[in-house]
């Protein structure tokens, strides 16, 4: 047996092990790079991140009117309610409601009282995502429906002056987004 054969015979397993580990390491690096690219592309784009939070000037919203803005691709109703609307919302017995949850991202797990659905203690400002919770249609407002609030013409859901479902197929109240007053005339959504 030649010296080369002896040397190969002594270290054959070591060379084989090295090639095995080198190939496995290269495969792991390649798989990690592919996984990183796949996960990274799922992050929101810059334009989506820019829309994640918006500021809305409500200085021109008169009592009894509403402003609709687009946020995250959905309409958001910002209503400045009248004293009659506030009183009508506060007189409702929770036992009459289909959905007894406030559906308020600012107050999770709160009951659907009028106070838990408005932005201020006086109940003047009501901010809701303007999407019917039945099949995603946009309800009409300004006193529409049988309860003086909003009405979804697609399938007949009626919402009261607090945006709570009162009649129809919608299973939940209109949802309230994360929102806060930055000052007396600016609301931040998101």
From Swiss-Prot:
Q: Which terms in the Gene Ontology molecular function aspect does this entry carry?
A: 2 iron, 2 sulfur cluster binding; metal ion binding; ubiquinol-cytochrome-c reductase activity
Q: Which domain of life is it from?
A: Bacteria
Q: How is the cofactor bound?
A: Binds 1 [2Fe-2S] cluster per subunit.
Q: Which PROSITE patterns match?
A: RIESKE, TAT
Q: Which Pfam families match?
A: Rieske, UCR_Fe-S_N
List the Gene3D superfamilies hit by this protein, alphabetically: Rieske [2Fe-2S] iron-sulphur domain (2.102.10.10), Single helix bin (1.20.5.510)
Q: Which UniProt keywords apply?
A: 2Fe-2S, Cell membrane, Disulfide bond, Electron transport, Iron, Iron-sulfur, Membrane, Metal-binding, Translocase, Transmembrane, Transmembrane helix, Transport
Q: What is its EC number?
A: 7.1.1.8
- Catalytic activity of the protein: a quinol + 2 Fe(III)-[cytochrome c](out) = a quinone + 2 Fe(II)-[cytochrome c](out) + 2 H(+)(out)
Mark the transmembrane ranges: 18-39
InterPro entries (UniProt xref): Rieske_2Fe-2S, Rieske_2Fe-2S_sf, Rieske_Fe-S_prot, Rieske_Fe-S_prot_C, TAT_signal, TAT_signal_bac_arc, Ubiq_cytC_Rdtase_Fe-S_su_TAT, Ubiquinol_cyt_c_Rdtase_Fe-S-su
Major subcellular site: membrane
Q: Main EC class of this protein?
A: translocase
An annotated GO cellular component of this protein is: plasma membrane
Chain ranges of the Rieske domain: 95-188
Its needed co-factors are:
[2Fe-2S] cluster
Q: Tell me the function of this protein.
A: Component of the ubiquinol-cytochrome c reductase complex (complex III or cytochrome b-c1 complex), which is a respiratory chain that generates an electrochemical potential coupled to ATP synthesis.
- Note the subunit structure: The main subunits of complex b-c1 are: cytochrome b, cytochrome c1 and the Rieske protein.
The record makes one more remark, namely: The Rieske protein is a high potential 2Fe-2S protein.
Which NCBIfam families does this UniProt record tie to the protein?
Answer: Rieske_proteo, TAT_signal_seq
Q: What is this protein called?
A: Ubiquinol-cytochrome c reductase iron-sulfur subunit
**Biological source species:** Paracoccus denitrificans
Q: Which gene encodes it?
A: petA
């Amino acid at each position: 047996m030649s010296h080369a054969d002896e040397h190969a015979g002594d270290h054959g397993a070591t060379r084989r092990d090295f090639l095995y580990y080198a190939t496995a390491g290269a495969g792991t690096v390649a798989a990690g790079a592919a996984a990183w690219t796949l996960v990274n592309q799922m992050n929101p784009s810059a334009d989506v991140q820019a829309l994640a939070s918006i500021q809305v000037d409500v200085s021109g919203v008169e009592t009894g009117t509403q402003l609709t803005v687009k946020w995250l691709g959905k309409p958001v109703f910002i209503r400045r309610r009248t004293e009659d609307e506030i009183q009508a919302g506060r007189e409702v017995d929770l036992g009459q409601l289909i959905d007894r949850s406030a559906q308020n991202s600012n107050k999770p797990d709160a009951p659907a009282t009028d106070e838990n659905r408005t932005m201020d203690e006086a109940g003047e400002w009501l901010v809701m995502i303007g999407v019917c919770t039945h099949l995603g249609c946009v309800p009409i407002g300004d006193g529409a429906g049988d309860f003086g609030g909003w009405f979804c013409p697609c399938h007949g859901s009626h919402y009261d002056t607090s945006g709570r479902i009162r009649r129809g197929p919608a299973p939940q109240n209109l949802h309230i987004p994360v929102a806060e007053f930055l000052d007396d005339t600016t609301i931040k959504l998101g």
